[in-house]
Amino acid sequence: MAKEVGFSLVYRDMWQSSGRYVPRVDQLREVAPAIIKMGCFDRVETNGGAFEQVNLLFGENPNTAVREWTRPFHEAGIRTHMLERGLNALRMNPVPADVRELMFKVKKAQGTDISRSFCGLNDHRNLRLSVEYAKKAGMVSQVALSITNSPVHTVEYYMGVVDKVVEYGCDEICLKDMAGIGRPSVLGRLVSEIKKKYPHIIVQYHGHTGPGFSPASMLEVARAGADYLDTAVEPLSWGKVHPDIITVREMLKADGFLVKDLDMDAYMEVRSLTQKFIDDFLGYWIDPNNSHMSSLLVGCGLPGGMMGSMMADLQGVHGAINAGLRKQGKAEINLDQLMVKLFREVEYAWPRLGYPPLVTPFSQYVKNTAILNLMSIMQGKPRWSNIDKDTWNMILGKMGKLPGALAPEIVALAKEKGLEFYEGNPQDAFPDELPKFRQMMKEEGWDEGQDQEELFEFAMHERQYRDYRSGVAKERFNKDLEERRAKAGAPKIVVRPVVEMPKFDIDSFVAAHPQAIPLQAPAKGQILWQLDVDDRSTAPAVGSAVKAGDCVGYVQTYYG
């Protein structure tokens, strides 16, 4: 009998791999029925990641959004899932244990069924509480392996993590191929090993399409026994996002797998509504480059979603780097050359920093270190001259154990700076904080909310929550949106350089060339002596021989 493979629609990650924001709750309510009508999805990713935080950023209540967004899927029998970052939960920095525990209680009460928990370093210690708290709250605990490609990230390495989290009691394993650089054959072997050792464990694959491996990886993991695959829909599929459900479904069907039918009318409705949301406001924060795939991502291993911020960073330092090169008497470089140098520097720095998987936030740390290294080198300073605080915390083990060994030069630099390596459990460094936040809510006169969901949001995202409550967040967001709309709708002004006619005395010219025959232009306009797309048009040298009938130049006539 053919094996059935189920599909999940990662509607939350589709948006956040493309741009900054997610649809408002009214838009999510609008698209949910069409997603359900498609008929092919067993699961939908509804929240987690930055979903809750960006709702606060545009002045909306994330608790309302999660409850109303998950409800129609429950009524249709579709399971919902969220993404959380282990020690960092729903933010970029460590979270106290009591706040982490409350998160699972709140999210279960709001309607989230499955918690996908990952640690960017694959440190099983950071995942233990995620498994325990998820199961205690009645959620399905799915642990995600942060997939990358390096000499230390072998099948055996990942199975070591799997062994520990299965021991902790997780229900499922996800292969989170966030940069899409996992090699298909390796991923297939990993799934095969998981299924062989733990046949009761559900396996789900999540991959990004940036470098191009993901469809092949999906076929390999399905053949090896994977149960679910994450997919997307147009216009936010492919590029540096996720494979589209249509292609993935047809690929598996042709390979003999049992897959659910897909209602194309409903697909087109989801596609149309998603485009409507883009046109409404979300598109103003979407980088067009994220719709393009790039094999340049294979070597450096950076997630495709980082390309926009990375190019902005490079543009910011481009001038300073060229100034440093000029000072040293060296040739300047253009932005493309700088990008290639950055990719090479990432390849150089990454192993020396202990091969942290290039997933949030560690991909940012490695990228930032590589950029700072480039600036130092091109200004004639030593590499590693500037390492930021967060990267040092990663190096010193305060966020978990690095997969690989640090380079001797990094260890020596830490000792030189008098820094100490942390050997304990990362969670132990962050004491409980809920009593403090309860007291602050009392002082503000704020209610803890249904199922303590307001208390949770305050403790998880204090600054953004305060801005949401005060109205500052919505005011700031609306101002930003107005500015972006004005900029997008402004007419494009093309500035044409004024071409000064060369000054000469016609009488002296005739006297010097008495045999010259003047040519009369057939129309009024601008003389183009040559057609040159790369450089300026230049007049022929005086005295050049011209035969009758030869083309001397061109006239660019005026419009109309």
Positions of predicted regions on the chain:
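Conserved, mostly hydrophobic/aromatic
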Residues: 14, 117, 165, 173, ...
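Active-site beta->alpha loop and helix N-cap motifs at the rims of alpha/beta catalytic domains
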Residues: 33, 42-43, 48-163, 179-180
